From Swiss-Prot:
<dbReference type="InterPro" id="IPR020631">
    <property type="entry name" value="THF_DH/CycHdrlase_NAD-bd_dom"/>
</dbReference>
<dbReference type="GO" id="GO:0006164">
    <property type="term" value="P:purine nucleotide biosynthetic process"/>
</dbReference>
<feature type="binding site">
    <location>
        <position position="191"/>
    </location>
    <ligand>
        <name>NADP(+)</name>
    </ligand>
</feature>
<dbReference type="GO" id="GO:0000105">
    <property type="term" value="P:L-histidine biosynthetic process"/>
</dbReference>
<keyword id="KW-0521">NADP</keyword>
<keyword id="KW-0658">Purine biosynthesis</keyword>
<protein>
    <recommendedName>
        <fullName>Bifunctional protein FolD</fullName>
        <ecNumber>1.5.1.5</ecNumber>
        <ecNumber>3.5.4.9</ecNumber>
    </recommendedName>
</protein>
<dbReference type="InterPro" id="IPR000672">
    <property type="entry name" value="THF_DH/CycHdrlase"/>
</dbReference>
<keyword id="KW-0560">Oxidoreductase</keyword>
<comment type="similarity">
    <text>Belongs to the tetrahydrofolate dehydrogenase/cyclohydrolase family.</text>
</comment>
<keyword id="KW-0378">Hydrolase</keyword>
<dbReference type="InterPro" id="IPR020630">
    <property type="entry name" value="THF_DH/CycHdrlase_cat_dom"/>
</dbReference>
<dbReference type="Pfam" id="PF00763">
    <property type="entry name" value="THF_DHG_CYH"/>
</dbReference>
<keyword id="KW-0486">Methionine biosynthesis</keyword>
<keyword id="KW-0554">One-carbon metabolism</keyword>
<comment type="pathway">
    <text>One-carbon metabolism; tetrahydrofolate interconversion.</text>
</comment>
<keyword id="KW-0511">Multifunctional enzyme</keyword>
Length: 298
């Protein structure tokens, strides 16, 4: 068996097109232009690329893009002051602070300071609690992208067994909540789980989000399963030249693709969906803040 490739570029492009249509409607009918802001502390190369791509995508969707680059030595107090400034800015409907931040800044303190209604990344404890309670919430972009891709590949997910490898607040826990909402039977596995390969082999939907390159082997995959690889790991690539690297996922792609029914590639998979879902979240936030109803299928 050779798996169908779940093309993140195609699905993300479709979602971004829907976002652009909704942005155009908001401009025409309500004179409202959604705005997404990103705060970057320091000069991490991967974060800089990611922030730049977010800005391009935001502008292409017809939205306002705001970027704030702060030096790595910026104090936690000054970062929190910038967060409060964005909380109060009516032109900014959604924003995020790009992680990781320097070690002297508490990531949780930053998350807690964000106004939950502007929490484009869906990480605030209030949004996490509402998601767990089945209430309307800002949903983390990467988990939302995972579920969209799983539904595209697997259709109706109701009754299927989903196994998530990873229990982070950023991906593992929220993707589990979203799959429960889709009426899946959900198992969360992690580094302390016993006999992890046998747990993974039970999955109709296998989500790998552990940050370990190639951890999930082909014999971990149930034949015909949908495999969603959230990992983005940079590993040495001597074949490209001295000091060169390449991106790989948490799944050993070539092995898993021989067993799975459908699989996301890295790159070209979940990462592209994350940006598209951030744009969608910002439009949702803009509508909620202005009492504007969204289309039912948005």
């Amino acid at each position: 068996m050779t798996a169908t490739i779940i093309d993140g570029k195609i699905i993300a492009t479709e979602l971004r097109a829907r976002v652009a249509v909704e942005v155009a409607r908001l401009k025409k009918d309500h004179s409202l232009t959604p705005g997404l802001a990103v705060v970057l502390v320091g000069n991490d190369p991967a974060s800089e690329v990611y922030v730049r791509n977010k800005g391009i995508a935001t502008t292409e969707a017809g939205m306002n893009s705001f970027e704030f680059k702060l030096p790595a030595e910026t104090s936690e107090a000054d970062v929190l002051a910038k967060v409060r400034e964005l909380n109060a800015d009516p032109a900014v409907h959604g924003f995020l602070v790009q992680f990781p931040v320097p070690n002297h800044i508490s990531q949780q303190a930053v998350i807690d300071a964000i106004d939950p209604v502007k929490d484009a990344d869906g990480l605030h404890p209030l949004n996490a609690g509402r998601l767990a309670s089945g209430l309307p919430a800002m949903v983390p972009a990467t988990p939302e992208g995972c579920v969209i891709m799983a539904k595209r590949a697997g259709g109706d997910l109701s009754g299927k067994h989903a196994v998530i490898i990873g229990r982070s607040n950023l991906v593992g826990k929220p993707v589990a909540q979203l799959l429960l909402k889709e009426n899946c039977t959900v198992t969360i596995a992690h580094s302390r789980s016993r006999d992890l390969p046998s747990i993974a082999r039970q999955a109709d939907i296998l989500v790998a989000a552990v940050g370990r390159p190639g951890m999930v082997r082909g014999d971990w995959v149930k034949p015909g399963a949908v495999v969603i690889d959230v990992g983005i790991n940079r590993v040495p690539a001597p074949e490209k030249g001295e000091g060169k690297t390449r991106l790989v996922g948490d799944v050993l792609f070539d092995e898993a693709a021989e067993v799975a029914g459908a699989i996301t590639p890295v790159p070209g998979g979940v990462g592209l969906m994350t940006v598209a879902c951030l744009l969608r979240n910002t439009v949702i936030a803009a509508c909620r803040q202005n009492g504007i109803a969204l289309p039912q299928d948005f």
